[in-house]
């Protein structure tokens, strides 16, 4: 048996180095090095706690803290040499700390395992990412409110089955996206609460024999509470899965919004125009102006769905406690957070710049018998049962299809052939303005309700 010594931190039990390919295969430093700031933050807090309980001297704590801050400076200046043979962000930083301050650096890991260390790092990182994402959601919602207020009176067709259904205002339509994003915001705030529980102190899986005071470390790191079970502390990735689930819902909303923007910018709809800075052209077709931002967001949604599925699959077969499988938690989590953050940023920049083509929207709303329900409701107010009214208006629509006339274009005599309850006052009901204005209740499309909803939305955002 070879007596060649391994240089790994755990190498005492081993009699030969790790195979070179296996070292590269099992290393995570190429992707987990982005946790460096949170790893250093956690280590400084851990060292401070160890000094408070007497495991480290104050001088040792100061040396560790000073060395770690210098290392952070090296990393941010691009002067840090990341080594694959040291496996991960934790051992790279610890090895460099020992190089800088000597044997004291080897004391940092007292009472701690990489198992609880990485679980803490990820939670710290995700907490910060959620805060950035929440700010981007708010910025997008502010843009939606501004555009909705400006377009509170702009009438467009509302759709079901992508067929003309009833007139709505463009402002009302935009506020539907505001509502979805509000739910996304709430979900992420809720996810942050469960993310912000500290596993540090769980050590490898059973806790530690040192007289640690976890509450001290938690307070230094801004955690709301400490985890109540060491086995769960090192093995739990629910918070990452929950984030990816919330991110998937948010991306699904952005994808649906993207689909509408793609449709609305097409020559077949022409409802809106996007500024050139949010579009690209074609290498062969000179006339093209492609809505690449919404198309790409629609496409990137699948990445986030994949991250959620990947993490669920990663965790479903693992026994307690920590397993090497969990190394695979970071890349999907990182990618999901990056994708959601960047997609929200793109939309927050783009939405306020949308230019509606009001006349085209209005003309589209005039087609497709969009006020048919209003005519049925009119007859109900005349005393007829709704089901009878539905049938009467259905016959009127059929007549309009064959005659090439929308309901508002028919004469009173033409309309009265379907019901003698129809009178001159029907024409006020059949206008687009009459249709949207009649839906004058909370959540309705009437322009004054749109403005009231915008005001409520601004109150909501200001309270965050």
From Swiss-Prot:
GO BP annotations listed = arginine biosynthetic process via ornithine; L-arginine biosynthetic process
PROSITE patterns associated with the record: FUMARATE_LYASES (PS00163)
Give the pathway annotation: Amino-acid biosynthesis; L-arginine biosynthesis; L-arginine from L-ornithine and carbamoyl phosphate: step 3/3
Q: Which UniProt keywords apply?
A: Amino-acid biosynthesis, Arginine biosynthesis, Cytoplasm, Lyase
Query: Sorted alphabetically, which Gene3D superfamilies does this protein's record hold?
Result: Fumarase/aspartase (C-terminal domain), Fumarase/aspartase (Central domain), Fumarase/aspartase (N-terminal domain)
Q: Which Pfam families match?
A: ASL_C2, Lyase_1
* Reaction(s) catalysed by this chain's protein: 2-(N(omega)-L-arginino)succinate = fumarate + L-arginine
Taken from the UniProt entry, a GO cellular component term is: cytosol
Where are the coiled-coil regions? Answer: none
Give a yes or no for keyword Cytoplasm in this entry.
yes
Compartments it resides in = Cytoplasm
Q: What EC numbers are recorded for this enzyme?
A: 4.3.2.1
**GO molecular function terms noted in the UniProt entry:** argininosuccinate lyase activity
Record protein name field: Argininosuccinate lyase
